[in-house]
Curated annotation (Swiss-Prot):
MF terms in GO: acireductone dioxygenase (Ni2+-requiring) activity; acireductone dioxygenase [iron(II)-requiring] activity; iron ion binding; nickel cation binding
Listed SUPFAM superfamilies: RmlC-like cupins
Entry protein name: Acireductone dioxygenase
Cofactor binding notes: Binds 1 Fe(2+) cation per monomer. Binds 1 nickel ion per monomer.
Top EC group: oxidoreductase
Marked site positions, May play a role in transmitting local conformational changes: D102
Essential cofactor(s): Fe(2+); Ni(2+)
Gene that produces this protein: mtnD
One Pfam assignment: ARD
Keywords from the UniProt entry: Amino-acid biosynthesis, Dioxygenase, Iron, Metal-binding, Methionine biosynthesis, Nickel, Oxidoreductase
Keyword Aminoacyl-tRNA synthetase: no
Binding of Ni(2+), residues: H97, H99, E103, H141
Pathway stated in the Swiss-Prot or TrEMBL entry: Amino-acid biosynthesis; L-methionine biosynthesis via salvage pathway; L-methionine from S-methyl-5-thio-alpha-D-ribose 1-phosphate: step 5/6
Organism phylogeny: Bacteria, Pseudomonadati, Pseudomonadota, Alphaproteobacteria, Acetobacterales
Amino acid sequence: MSHLTVYRDDDPDDIVLRTDDAAVIADALRGIGARFERWDSPVVPPLDATPDAVLNTYRPYLDELMGETGAGSADVVRINAATPNLTALRDKFLSEHTHSEDEVRFFVHGSGNFVLHVDGRVYDVCCTAGDLISVPRGTPHWFDAGLSPDVVALRVFTDTTGWIADYTGDDIARRFPVS
């Protein structure tokens, strides 16, 4: 189940908010410029569906989202035990970074935590299948799919060159294990 835990950024033991209510999650993230939604698709593609099948399943949602955001492309990413260089990839995601465009993800299968560092707070959002999250450009954050990930997600891009991170150099992600 999706949930949000908010901490003060100087104390990982000081929980400011913890909720699994999607409306409360959306409101809390909206307050920092992020977006969170639940998409209820009548059909969920199988875990081993081809990227095209996954994209086609969610095409109506993607068309609307891409029209709203001006995004130019979408693709499917799978992160699991068979992912080449999984450890190095996880290390990249776990380092606090920003992007020059919004980072938009929709979880088709599995789960992962997007952790946003904004205005003295750490917002740990556990996203599960059916969740859409959009992290605003320039927002320091990191991502953790866990030690044994099994995630399928849609990625939506404005810049067709794909995922490019600008690392902050802050080690805060090491101090805040995901909830």
